[in-house]
């Protein structure tokens, strides 16, 4: 006899299923379940009197060596830029994603996937009612403080690319010895890392020694001179070394205007940092670069989304970040040229249309490490409020396309640009099991658990002397995976292919596995999932700074209230 459950009762027991919609945090965004892998009546449920017991949902004779999972996150809603929005069980084995599907005991349950068998060596994490996203990537990190890693993990970021080592504002780690020392220091961090070398040189020899030492990419920064000669030399070397180049262009237009920079790039792939320009870049029209297929644009989070406070906050930040003197008129003019309300307003819209493909932090160099994810979703909500549903979502009573567009900005797209999408960026089989679990009410602002390489590294945890894990104060705390030698097996250190072949990991005594970046030079805007729009006639007025596409003014109103903000913080 089949028992039929009302939808509300089923959701209370096993989480949402096909057709259910989930509100993300206190935003207006609604995620609708597109597919459920469950076999109704045979759900994998852990606990007293539940199904994941010996001879029931657990196949007793299957060992880990036979293929049983290490972990299964049961009945979780997956929000993923590649897999979409679906419900199922996530299987993890040897630190890698096995798959999203139906887990359990095939001897007693219907529909169990062959590769998702639960055995005595499997730990089941009851994730019904939770949302799982891929671990986030931030590929514009100023490593000024080692404590950035704690804030990154606590917010759901599990991969960090950047440079610097304290005291400097540029996102690069110049020189082979500095690269070596930073790689050795980062061996203590339970995150995936990669470091950029200094790309500002009109001769290639200084670039090569940094890449051979372990730099995973190069950074061109105006404070070191982003001249056409340096740009061309860096990109020419990058083509031979298969590394990505990131650029912070010339705000003052001293060595050329945006047209000269475009000509120097000459059709080669390049990651254009803070493309709007408040973080730096040709004033006032660096934003015009979003309209080209080989330009891979990102934003940094201080200007996202545009609010009534954004303009005033940025002036002071620029003065401090670039060591400017408020008593020197030229320094003040430099700062004021970078901060333009009109281009900041257009930036939100360009994200919503998919013209800007990635979100990053610019940590401690105007941006905030722990706000990449929250500001991404604040922008998505603001755009829904001001612009309505996207055409792809119109009539669905949900926001699935917009949700996939925005989650891709800090997961799969930066992974593709950095050349590491074989390892991270989505919850696809074979990738590192970097997973963030969220309670829907706290989605985008406070993770419940951060899984790194298939093991918990941070989670909401109560007082250690309390009788239960839920005893207050409950706060984000490190877990066992962040400690001892465990952390080395959970992460990857990314270097150039040249450095990997040379064995820098062994030479430097690194315990964390070292892997090469790959495929960076062929990346184009068309490869950016849900964010591949190339406006072919974008113009910035040199006097008013107004942005237009095909003659149509692109702008939005500053927000005076945002979700995922004070409601969640004391």
Curated annotation (Swiss-Prot):
Protein localization: Cytoplasm
Keyword terms, alphabetized: Cytoplasm, Hydrolase, Metal-binding, Nickel
UniProt remark on cofactor binding: Binds 2 nickel ions per subunit.
Binding site for substrate: 221
Pathway connected to this protein: Nitrogen metabolism; urea degradation; CO(2) and NH(3) from urea (urease route): step 1/1
Pfam family, one: Urease_alpha
Catalytically driven reaction(s): urea + 2 H2O + H(+) = hydrogencarbonate + 2 NH4(+)
GO molecular function terms listed in the Swiss-Prot or TrEMBL record: hydrolase activity, acting on carbon-nitrogen (but not peptide) bonds, in cyclic amides; nickel cation binding; urease activity
Classification via SUPFAM superfamilies: Composite domain of metallo-dependent hydrolases, Metallo-dependent hydrolases
Stored Gene3D superfamilies: Metal-dependent hydrolases, Urease, subunit C, domain 1
Active site: 322
Residues the record lists as N6-carboxylysine modifications: 219
Keyword Hydrolase belongs to the record: yes
Domain Urease: 135-570
Cofactors required: Ni cation
Residue numbers binding Ni(2+) 1: 140, 142, 219, 362
Any GO CC annotation of this UniProt entry: cytoplasm
EC number: 3.5.1.5
GO biological process: urea catabolic process
Family: Belongs to the metallo-dependent hydrolases superfamily. Urease alpha subunit family.
Assembly and oligomerization: Heterotrimer of UreA (gamma), UreB (beta) and UreC (alpha) subunits. Three heterotrimers associate to form the active enzyme.
UniProt-recorded name of the protein: Urease subunit alpha
Organism: Natronomonas pharaonis (strain ATCC 35678 / DSM 2160 / CIP 103997 / JCM 8858 / NBRC 14720 / NCIMB 2260 / Gabara) (Halobacterium pharaonis)
């Amino acid at each position: 006899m089949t028992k039929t459950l009302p939808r509300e009762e089923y959701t209370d027991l096993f989480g949402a299923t096909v057709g259910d919609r989930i509100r993300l945090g206190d935003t207006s965004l609604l995620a609708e379940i597109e597919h459920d892998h469950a076999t109704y009546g045979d759900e994998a449920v852990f606990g007293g009197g539940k199904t994941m017991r010996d001879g029931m949902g657990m196949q007793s004779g299957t060992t880990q060596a036979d293929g049983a999972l290490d972990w299964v996150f049961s009945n979780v809603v997956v929000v993923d830029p590649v897999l979409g929005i679906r419900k199922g069980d996530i299987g993890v084995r040897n630190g890698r994603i096995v798959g999203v599907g139906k887990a359990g005991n095939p001897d007693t349950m219907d529909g169990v996937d062959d590769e998702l068998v639960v055995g005595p060596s499997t730990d089941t994490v009851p994730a019904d009612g939770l949302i799982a996203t891929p671990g986030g990537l931030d590929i514009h990190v100023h490593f000024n403080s080692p404590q950035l890693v704690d804030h990154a993990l606590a917010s759901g970021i599990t991969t960090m690319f950047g440079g610097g080592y304290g005291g400097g504002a540029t996102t690069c780690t110049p020189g082979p010895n500095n690269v070596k020392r930073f790689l050795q220091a980062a061996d203590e961090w339970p995150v995936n890392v990669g470091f950029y070398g200094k790309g500002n040189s009109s001769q290639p020899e200084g670039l090569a020694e940094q890449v051979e030492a372990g730099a995973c990419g190069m950074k061109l920064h105006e404070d070191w001179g982003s001249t056409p000669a340096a740009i061309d030399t860096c990109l020419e070397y990058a083509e031979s070394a298969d590394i990505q180049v990131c650029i912070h262009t010339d705000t003052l237009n001293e060595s050329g205007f945006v047209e000269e920079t475009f000509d120097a790039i000459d059709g080669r792939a390049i990651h254009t940092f803070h493309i709007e320009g408040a973080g730096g870049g040709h004033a006032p029209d660096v934003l015009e670069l979003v309209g080209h297929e080989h330009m891979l644009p990102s934003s940094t989070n201080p200007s996202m989304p545009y609010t009534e406070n954004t303009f005033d906050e940025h002036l002071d930040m620029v003065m401090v970040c670039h060591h400017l003197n408020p008593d020197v008129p030229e320094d003040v003019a430099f700062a004021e040229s970078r901060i333009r309300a009109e281009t900041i307003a257009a930036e939100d819209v360009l994200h919503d249309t998919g013209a800007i493909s990635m979100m990053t932090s610019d940590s401690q160099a105007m941006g905030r490490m722990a706000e990449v994810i929250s500001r991404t979703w604040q922008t998505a909500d603001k755009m829904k409020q001001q612009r309505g549903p996207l055409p792809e979502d119109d009539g669905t009573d949900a926001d699935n396309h917009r949700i996939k567009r925005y989650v891709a900005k800090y997961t799969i797209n930066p992974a593709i640009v950095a050349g590491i999408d074989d390892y991270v960026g989505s919850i696809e089989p074979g990738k590192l099991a970097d997973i963030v679990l969220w309670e829907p009410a706290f989605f985008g602002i406070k993770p419940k658990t951060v899984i790194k390489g298939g093991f918990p590294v941070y989670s909401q945890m109560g007082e250690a002397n309390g009788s239960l894990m839920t005893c207050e104060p409950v706060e984000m705390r490190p877990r066992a995976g962040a400690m001892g030698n465990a952390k080395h097996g959970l992460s990857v250190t990314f270097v150039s292919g040249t450095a990997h072949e040379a064995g820098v990991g062994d030479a430097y005594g690194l315990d964390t596995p070292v892997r090469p970046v790959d495929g960076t030079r062929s990346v184009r805007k068309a490869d950016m999932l849900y964010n591949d729009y190339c406006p072919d006639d974008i113009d910035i007025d040199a006097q008013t700074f107004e942005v237009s596409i095909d003659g149509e003014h692109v702008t939005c109103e500053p927000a005076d209230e945002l979700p995922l903000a004070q409601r969640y913080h004391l």
